[in-house]
């Protein structure tokens, strides 16, 4: 806490960055955000595009994508939702003592992610540096971004929502 107004040893911006980082790395932050995502998806999104709308969650890294996948999957199950999530990332990650990859978490090979996401019950795609460029899914209607995006990455990522589908309204 800054006690002297002109303290040269205190950098307000650096302190804010550190505090934000501390809050963001807490598991409770992911759980709370996952709750907002699931609630918003069910109340505002799932009935769009004639009841076929999909959503993408853009995570900052693989660990965060796995945390989102687990939290969102648990919340969907708890509310007895007819929908499921898919996670997409490259490689493997050791998380809480277990090594995971896409196939282990999703229950099907990575090569089937795009095909599976086009059909129910899969409605939420959680990604870490994957499917953010060159991915064309007209049913993708909403994007939840939990990652800093700038310049061309922002344009490329958000352009995933700019695909033509009759009666499509996009949320960001």
Where would I find each of the regions flagged by the language model?
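Conserved two-lobed SF2 helicase motor
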Residues: 120-132
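Conserved SF2 helicase motif VI
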Residues: 152-165
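Conserved motor-coupling elements within RecA-like helicase/translocase cores
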Residues: 96-122
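Interdomain helical connector at the RecA1-RecA2 junction of SF1/SF2 helicase-like NTPases
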Residues: 1-52, 69
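Conserved small/polar residues in nucleotide/adenosyl-binding loops
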Residues: 170-171
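A short beta-strand element within the Helicase C-terminal
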Residues: 136-147
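Conserved helicase motor
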Residues: 87-94, 128-130
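Conserved helicase motor "Helicase C" RecA-like lobe of SF1/SF2 P-loop NTPases
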Residues: 63-86
